[in-house]
From Swiss-Prot:
Classification via InterPro entries: Mur-like_cat_sf, Mur_ligase_C, Mur_ligase_C_dom_sf, Mur_ligase_cen, Mur_ligase_N, MurCDEF_pg_biosynth, UDP-N-AcMur_Ala_ligase_MurC
Organism: Rickettsia bellii (strain RML369-C)
The protein's name: UDP-N-acetylmuramate--L-alanine ligase
Biological process, per Gene Ontology: cell division; cell wall organization; peptidoglycan biosynthetic process; regulation of cell shape
Amino-acid positions noted as binding ATP in the UniProt annotation, renumbered to this chain: 120-126
Pathway listed: Cell wall biogenesis; peptidoglycan biosynthesis
Length: 478
């Protein structure tokens, strides 16, 4: 980055090319580099919200991957999803163009900043957004690189004016260990990305390194409601750790007097920090998003704000300004007085949290929960097949589509149909159905939706596109 800075100063800018620039992680870094004045371009297999947004900023976007796309580039940036068989990667190797991993480029952006890195199996994107809102309310105006679209800004990344940078740290391939952060947040740790880590212990050890790699003056923020995180924290003595939770009375920061509805959550906070006498209570914090898991995400942000002495007013103002994150329990349509929710949940624990929130709301409205789930990646489904069978308890009606491959090859015996077959066979759900086509969801909604129902469309694939097209589809029916 220092070399790039020197070249920028000398007006000898060279082009940085992003392969897979439409991904949430890649697009954010590309946008920040562009805003810093670097020459950026990229390619992706198809257009999406991110590519169109970047193109509107003046960033050149190629649809499709071909060697010709990198004719005049000096650096190529790739994520872990891009393999060496990619034609642009092959061309870069042939021409000896430096290939930089996404996490390395993120690390370079963070190196010269005071950085907050948010990691964990679930909740990273919302937590990153909440932390950013608190920094803004405290007048610190950070640079932010997130894994989802922040509704306040309609982007997943923006350049701030201060020396602070807040970033979502992806744990999928252990590169998050090398991110030079001052503050590290761990929301939870579940068996995920085992195709890379091979076993759960290796993943846990990576999170340990994430904390111990902090500078001595930094600190970690960890949710000890989660058993694995608690065990991890109990064995760390070389770094300062602030803990939070709802069910953990021994946590430094806890929530109580909790109430939720379809649009928000309200709660009080108790603060009891180590080596600080007395207890502080913050009353009636409200966030415009429902769910216990989002209260936990808020507690992570509060922990950072308290430790950095933002003050109660800034913390409350920060939450008041928060407008949520795209695809996190987002209402996209209504049909027959039933709400259609678009949600990114694609891991069993995320599904349970989302459906629990939906069930709580549906019960208050005398409705039912209709879950429509699109599995994401054959490898994830294979590793967590048993957990997927057990995670739909809060759905009154369950519909599962086939797997969104995300570039993976099929695995024998792993499919949406096989998941449904096993759920029925082992009696985990008595109202489970397979949808041969995602388009069949429209008929399900039309035939099953009743007033007060919560229709939850979940997954990390293209189910979101379908969900967001529903208002138009409903309009065409009239």
């Amino acid at each position: 980055m220092l070399l790039l800075e020197l070249k920028k100063t000398n007006q000898t800018l060279e082009t940085i090319h992003f392969i897979g620039i439409g991904g949430v992680g890649m697009s954010g870094i590309a946008e920040i580099l562009h805003n810093l004045g670097y020459k950026v371009q990229g390619s992706d297999l198809s257009e999406n919200y991110n590519t169109k947004r970047l193109e509107a900023y003046g960033i050149k976007i190629f649809v499709g991957h071909t060697p010709q796309n990198i004719t005049n580039v000096s650096y190529v940036v790739v994520s872990s999803a891009i393999n060496r068989n990619n034609p642009e990667v092959k061309e870069a190797l042939e021409r000896k163009i430096p290939i930089i991993r996404r996490a390395e480029m993120l690390a370079e952006l963070m190196r010269l900043k005071c950085s907050v890195a948010v990691s964990g199996s679930h909740g990273k994107t919302t937590t990153t957004s909440l932390v950013a809102c608190l920094f803004e309310a405290a007048g610190l105006h950070p640079t932010v690189i997130n894994g989802g679209i922040i509704n306040n800004r309609s982007t997943n990344a923006y350049l701030g004016s201060s020396n602070y940078l807040i970033a979502e740290a992806d744990e999928s391939d252990a590169t998050f260990i090398s991110i030079p952060s001052t503050i590290a947040i761990i929301t939870n740790i579940d068996p995920e990305h085992l195709d890379y880590y091979k076993d759960f212990d290796t993943l846990i050890n990576a999170f340990r390194s994430f904390i111990t790699n902090l500078p001595f003056y930094g600190f970690a923020v960890c949710c000890i409601d989660h058993k694995i995180v608690r065990e991890l924290v109990n064995n760390i003595t070389e770094r300062k750790v602030i803990t939070y939770g709802i069910d953990s009375d021994d946590a430094h920061i806890t929530a109580f007097n909790i109430s939720t509805d379809i649009t928000s959550s309200t709660f009080d906070v108790k603060i009891s920090l180590p080596n600080v006498s007395g207890v502080t209570i913050i009353e009636k914090i409200t966030i415009p998003t429902p769910g216990r898991h989002n209260i936990l995400n808020s507690l992570a942000a509060i922990s950072v704000g308290v430790e950095l002495d933002f003050g109660i007013k800034a913390i409350k103002n920060g939450f008041n300004s928060f407008k949520g994150v795209k695809r996190r329990f987002t209402k996209v349509a209504e049909y027959n007085q039933a709400s259609v929710i678009d949600d990114y949940a694609h891991h069993p624990e995320e599904i349970k949290a989302t459906l629990s929130t939906a069930k709580n709301i549906a019960n208050k409205q005398h409705g039912k929960v209709i879950a429509i789930f699109q599995p994401h990646r054959y490898s994830r489904m294979q590793h967590l097949f048993d957990d997927f069978m057990r995670c739909f308890d809060d759905a009154d009606l369950l519909y599962i589509t086939d797997v969104y491959a995300a570039g993976e090859s099929p695995i024998e015996g792993i499919s949406g149909q096989s998941l449904i077959d096993n759920i029925i066979k082992l009696k985990y759900h008595n109202q489970a159905n397979f949808l041969a086509k995602l388009d069949d969801s429209l008929e399900v909604i039309m035939n099953k939706a009743s007033p007060g129902d919560m229709i939850i469309m979940m997954g990390a694939g293209n189910i979101s596109n379908f969900a967001n097209e529903l208002p138009q589809k409903f309009g065409n029916l009239s």
